[in-house]
Amino acid sequence: YPLMLRLMALDPAPSVYLARPCYNGRVTAPPCDSALWTQARYSAEVVDSAVAVARRLLSQRQSQTLLLIGHSGGGTLAMLMADQLPETRAVITLAGNLDTDAWTQYHGYEPLRGSLNPARRPPRDKHLLQLHRVGENDDTLPPPMLKRATETQWRARVGTVAGYDHSCCWPQLWPIVLETTVQAAGSGAWAGR
């Protein structure tokens, strides 16, 4: 199971798992195109689709606020979605790819030409809480890459977790991450830069 599904099981609060379009066995179903899970995996089309689902869920539940959480590429989408969802109170990323250009260069991959890059967007709203965590042994998204990607953000808290890598051990930390976020959101903490 994807990491985020395992983490959701540890949280008693209501939550929804939003998979990226054309992932999880649906790559050949229309309107999927290989670009939507390769070069355009973070395209405006993908982000708009996720935002539309979030808006529908907000209206169905008559919710006023939203907490976006993502691991790896899910963190990329969470940051891009927050730009369009003013209801977003906080974004949490675990090993989040917040600079897709730096990531492709680091690994020697082709640039994601059809995708948006969170690092190229203006700083997020000053009221948006951001908690970003990365494992010290993460060689998929090394800690310095995440730190550089968040330098211009107003209320970003970046933490490196000893002994963790890209996927190892996050369920152990999850209850603490949730508690920290709830406390910070409720108290108006995280003064920012």
Per-range role (PLM):
Residues 55-110:
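Primarily recognizes the serine-hydrolase "nucleophile elbow" in alpha/beta-hydrolase
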Residues 169-183:
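Post-His helix in hydrolase/transferase enzymes
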Residues 96-168:
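The feature captures the conserved acid-bearing segment of alpha/beta-hydrolase catalytic domains
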Residues 32-60:
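Alpha/beta-hydrolase active-site loop
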Residues 1-40:
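Active-site machinery of serine-nucleophile hydrolases
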Residues 3-7, 46-53, 73:
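Stable alpha-helical elements in mature extracytoplasmic
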Residues 188-193:
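Alpha/beta-hydrolase-fold serine-hydrolase catalytic core, especially in secreted/extracellular enzymes
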